[in-house]
Amino acid sequence: MEVKIITDISVEPVTVAEARTYLRITTTAQDTLIGELITDARERLEKFTNLSFGAKTLKCRWDVLDGWAEIPYQPNAVVSACINDAGDTLSYDTKGLEYKYLWCVNSTGVTITYTAGFTTLPKALKVAILKEVATSYENRENFYIEGTFNELSNDAKRMAQSYSRN
């Protein structure tokens, strides 16, 4: 399965002002850096949880799809197109309320286009972004614990784990 972001979220779920307050920074001199750290933290946490933290348009492709498959980077997925490699529109069905599954019978090269994402990000995920921004701000080099590189801080992982779809 391959996922491609067509249109990313338009507004980050954490503002620079919120991050500045969390970091106890009183000036705006670091706002550009903080904004970049917010985007980076959100993207890494989205990969960790397999969720979309805001509305975005995505394409997902399966080499072979026969039966039900969970649509990645949800919640609230709305499929707008389902085609095969030849460009033929395929019959499909979805099930699920907040987290959707796609059904397609014995098809190869299936690509769906869909929109997905939280309308309001849960507080724990917002705090996870803030914790990751703080860790990245304080540790601007690679982040190591006991000689091992960590993509996310333990605090951010702990806050996001209960939402993870991985």
Regions found by a protein language model. Give the residues of each.
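Divalent metal-cofactor coordination and adjacent catalytic microenvironments
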Residues: 1-166
